[in-house]
């Protein structure tokens, strides 16, 4: 009789390696699945390690391009920033990982999926809500949430099951990273008054260490999609990686944020999002040039709602699909080039041009070349002010009547 199969979201670290043994001891054939969203890991080494520690099968998937095009791009076009500050680094990768885990489960006939999230964070919700949105009958296991071990007990379990324990200096931080950025928490960062030390950062230099000379680049967008830097076209994932290094070298993208977690607690996080910071600024700048006024004023409502949906793990909800449809429609006119200066932590959009520009210099100028019909303003103002004017007239008339009636009473 064949064993029940389970797909484990596998990182190659101690926690998920121990999870392989724990799930095996529970009676599963474990399919270790490592999905690369831009962490820079050695996929082949992770694949081999999964087999060495007891996985029935080990699968690695390079999903950087899918991540960039299917998940990062909609968030960029929606200017998705949780609480107006966090570009949703980890939250964006979870629905992509879920998508791949479910696909692998279907491929191998697995009846369950396992993840390695704690019972205190947002990710457990994102994984499980996403899995059940795509595969409602799929069973879910969470070894780390279930076993309640101390670090010492986990290490002993690893030794008992022949799992190599890495002998390295323990990092005080908990780090998650992908193409779109790097998230760091724990250690001294748990004190919101303490300044983040230098070793909390990896993708960015400090403002003090940033070059004294700015770098100016031009970013090209086609229907809201960044397609080129300084005229050099490249796939979105490569563009993000290139821009990440460049912007990070100028100290751009450091975010120190105390955020409201889905599970009800506040958490202090240090984020590094160099490419995201630049692209969000440039995309918004081009939209300012090309979006019609009512669309431009309404779109932030959609952006805020989408940010919350992504953060709270509801990427596959019906509402998300509807909101993305609005964003897609709004991007048809977002074509052009934005000139951006990078300097000591600052992103300065200093020029923009577009074939869809709604800026008309002849209407905007205050010189003799002005084509704006100022005489038309008089009639427009009379119509525009009419509701408030009539309201004021009626109120004044009623106040006068009340005053007269009061005088007559005496």
Swiss-Prot record:
Instruction: Report the enzyme's class at the first EC level.
Output: ligase
Q: Which GO terms describe its molecular function?
A: argininosuccinate synthase activity; ATP binding
Q: Which residues bind L-aspartate?
A: 118, 122-123
Is Secreted there in the keyword field?
no
- EC assignment: the record states 6.3.4.5
Any one Gene Ontology BP term: argininosuccinate metabolic process
GO cellular component terms, alphabetically, are: cytoplasm
What are the binding positions for L-citrulline in this chain? Answer: 86, 122, 126, 174, 259, 271
Q: Which residues form a coiled coil?
A: none
Which keywords does this chain's UniProt record carry?
Amino-acid biosynthesis, Arginine biosynthesis, ATP-binding, Cytoplasm, Ligase, Nucleotide-binding
Q: PROSITE patterns recorded for this chain?
A: ARGININOSUCCIN_SYN_1, ARGININOSUCCIN_SYN_2
Q: Which residues does the annotation say bind ATP?
A: 9-17, 116
Cellular localisation: Cytoplasm
Pathway, according to UniProt?
Amino-acid biosynthesis; L-arginine biosynthesis; L-arginine from L-ornithine and carbamoyl phosphate: step 2/3
- Write out the catalysed reaction: L-citrulline + L-aspartate + ATP = 2-(N(omega)-L-arginino)succinate + AMP + diphosphate + H(+)
Q: Which InterPro entries match?
A: Arginosuc_syn_C (IPR048268), Arginosuc_syn_N (IPR048267), Arginosuc_synth (IPR001518), Arginosuc_synth_CS (IPR018223), Arginosuc_synth_type_1_subfam (IPR023434), AS_cat/multimer_dom_body (IPR024074), Rossmann-like_a/b/a_fold (IPR014729)
Kindly state the subunit structure of this protein.
Answer: Homotetramer.
Enumerate the NCBIfam families for this protein: argG, PRK00509.1
Family membership: Belongs to the argininosuccinate synthase family. Type 1 subfamily.
Under which name does UniProt file this protein? Argininosuccinate synthase
**What species does this protein belong to?**
Limosilactobacillus reuteri (strain DSM 20016)
């Amino acid at each position: 009789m064949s064993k029940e199969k389970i797909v484990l979201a596998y990182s190659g670290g101690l926690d998920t390696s121990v999870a392989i043994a724990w799930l095996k001891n529970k009676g599963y054939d474990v399919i270790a699945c490592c999905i690369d969203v831009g962490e820079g890991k050695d996929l082949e080494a992770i694949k081999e390690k999964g087999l060495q520690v007891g996985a029935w099968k080990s699968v690695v998937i390079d999903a950087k391009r899918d991540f960039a095009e299917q998940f990062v791009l909609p968030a960029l076009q929606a200017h998705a920033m949780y609480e107006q500050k966090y570009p949703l680094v980890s939250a964006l990768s979870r629905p992509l990982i879920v998508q791949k885990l479910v696909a692998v489960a279907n491929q191998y006939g697995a009846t369950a999926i396992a993840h390695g999230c704690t019972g205190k964070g947002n990710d457990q919700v994102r994984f499980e809500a996403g899995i059940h949105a795509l595969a409602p009958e799929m069973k879910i296991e969470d070894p780390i949430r279930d076993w309640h071990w101390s670090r010492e007990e986990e290490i002993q379990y690893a030794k008992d099951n022949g799992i190599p324990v890495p002998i390295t200096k323990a990092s005080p931080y908990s780090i998650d990273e992908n193409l779109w950025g790097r998230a760091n928490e724990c250690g001294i960062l748990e004190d919101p008054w303490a300044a983040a030390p230098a070793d909390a950062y990896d993708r960015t230099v400090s403002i003090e260490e940033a070059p004294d000379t700015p770098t100016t680049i031009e970013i090209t967008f086609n229907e809201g999609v960044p397609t080129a830097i300084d005229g050099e076209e490249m796939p979105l994932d490569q563009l993000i990686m290139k821009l990440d290094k460049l912007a990070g070298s100028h100290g751009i993208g450091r975010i120190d944020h105390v955020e409201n977690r889905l599970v009800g607690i506040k958490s202090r996080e240090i984020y590094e999002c160099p490419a995201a910071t630049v692209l969000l600024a440039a995309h918004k700048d081009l939209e300012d040039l090309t979006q019609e006024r009512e669309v431009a004023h309404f779109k932030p409502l959609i952006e805020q709602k989408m940010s919350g949906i992504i953060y709270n793990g509801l990427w596959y909800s019906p509402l998300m699909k509807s909101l993305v449809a609005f964003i897609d429609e709004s991007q048809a006119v977002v074509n052009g080039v934005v000139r951006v200066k990078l300097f000591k932590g600052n992103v300065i959009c200093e020029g923009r041009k577009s074939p869809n520009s709604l800026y008309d210099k002849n209407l905007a100028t205050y010189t003799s070349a002005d084509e704006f019909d100022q005489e038309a303003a008089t009639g427009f103002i009379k119509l525009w002010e009419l509701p408030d004017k009539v309201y004021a007239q009626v109120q004044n008339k009623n106040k006068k009547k009340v005053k007269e009636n009061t005088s007559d009473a005496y």
